[in-house]
């Protein structure tokens, strides 16, 4: 039984972002149900969108909604699903990349306010350290 779940373009992104000083183990894969989670980065900084962006177009052309589970990343292809886990409390959420950014130095991913608050402590303001994993659905290749 062969299962394929990695997109070649994501493979290139993962390896181009991993340096000899990076603590990320890019070969770390977890399987839960029909999904695999491939570690992309630990200790990444996440922030969230301000409400003023609601209703504006994202780089993918979609209209931004701060109540949906979406995110911005500088490199992931639009439509990529990632699991974002708050390293302080272990809470996680799955978001779909539909925009580019963040453009603040040191930030890796911008989450919608809904996604950010789902995994934040207390009222969920500011930024947090997160683990980012690529999400792929396992597709059975047997006919």
Name these PLM-found stretches.
Residues 1-143:
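Secreted/periplasmic proteins
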């Amino acid at each position: 039984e062969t299962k394929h779940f990695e997109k070649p373009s994501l493979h290139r992104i993962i390896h181009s972002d991993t340096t000899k000083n990076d603590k990320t183990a890019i070969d770390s894969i977890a399987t839960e149900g029909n999904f695999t989670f491939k570690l992309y980065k630990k200790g990444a900084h996440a922030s969230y969108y301000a409400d003023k962006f609601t209703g504006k177009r994202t780089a993918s052309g979609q209209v931004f909604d701060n109540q949906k589970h979406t995110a911005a990343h500088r490199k992931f292809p639009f439509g990529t699903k990632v699991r974002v886990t708050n390293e302080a409390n272990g809470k996680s959420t799955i978001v779909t990349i539909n925009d580019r950014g963040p453009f603040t130095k040191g930030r890796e991913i911008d989450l919608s306010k809904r996604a950010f608050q789902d995994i934040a402590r207390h009222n969920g303001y500011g930024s947090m350290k997160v683990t980012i994993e690529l999400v792929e659905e396992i597709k059975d290749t047997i006919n």
